[in-house]
Regions:
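Functionally critical loop-and-helix segments that line ligand-binding/catalytic clefts
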Residues: 183
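Short, conserved active-site entrance elements at the starts or edges of catalytic domains
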Residues: 156
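Cell-wall glycan-active module
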Residues: 1-4, 12-147, 151, 159-172, ...
Length: 219
């Protein structure tokens, strides 16, 4: 009897899950855009059934007041300050060999690489707030003008997660959907990220891969 009840509940749950997916704009758009030769539909179905999916209404509010719209005088105060300079000097002293190794391989000025790492995440101190999935999911549903862009990025993100065996809800990033210490959007991560330490995985929070990816982006 218990088994029968459980079976009925399971069938009902799967039925409603299917209906909710068919009505989900994000699911529909991602299904259209994702490379199904790389990512099977069954994987997409599984991801969109995750109970951790949610929309964050704070995200449209953040877009309405972006840092990038500030004047240079305001913007400068966020980045050129004593604490960030100290963090940069400390990071350089601890990672000097790696920085020059990356610089030599890609023929990119080491201090440009360092500066970008400082601007994008303050050397790994400021890089997250929302899961990448939920950020892009929210943009699709709550920001119609960004839906096309966000669905392309969500498709790119799921391609990365599938290839590298990463839980899509495990990575946090900015309100815009950029992630990792280099703050790449998913399509750029797929295009420019490198496995600099040759461990078989492109890791957005490991400095060898991060610095290598930043340099590769600049080449």
């Amino acid at each position: 009897m218990v088994l029968k009840v459980f079976s009925i509940i399971t069938i009902i749950s799967l039925t409603f899950a299917g209906e909710s997916r068919s009505d989900d704009l994000a699911y529909q758009l991602v299904l259209e855009k994702i490379n199904k030769k790389v990512v099977p539909t069954s994987y997409i179905d599984e991801i969109f059934n995750n109970p951790s999916i949610e929309k964050h209404l704070e995200i449209p509010e953040r877009f309405a007041k972006p840092y990038e719209k500030k004047s240079w005088e305001q913007y400068k105060k966020l980045f050129i300050k004593e604490s960030r300079i100290v963090a940069g000097v400390k990071f350089y002293s601890e990672n000097k060999d790696l920085v020059f190794q990356v610089s030599k391989k890609y023929d990119v000025d080491p201090f440009i690489i360092l500066s970008i790492a400082g601007i994008e995440s303050n050397y790994g101190r400021h890089y997250k707030g929302f899961t990448v999935f939920n950020s892009l999911y929210t943009q699709i549903h709550e920001m119609p003008k960004r839906a096309k862009w966000a669905s392309n990025e969500l498709a790119s993100y799921l391609e990365y997660c599938y290839k590298d065996n990463v839980d899509p809800q495990s990575i946090e990033g900015s309100y815009a959907g950029a992630f990792g210490f280099g703050q790449f959007i998913p399509s750029s991560f797929n295009r420019y990220s490198v496995d600099f330490d040759d461990d078989g995985v492109r890791r957005p929070h490991d400095w060898p891969d991060v610095l290598g990816s930043i340099a590769n982006y600049l080449v």
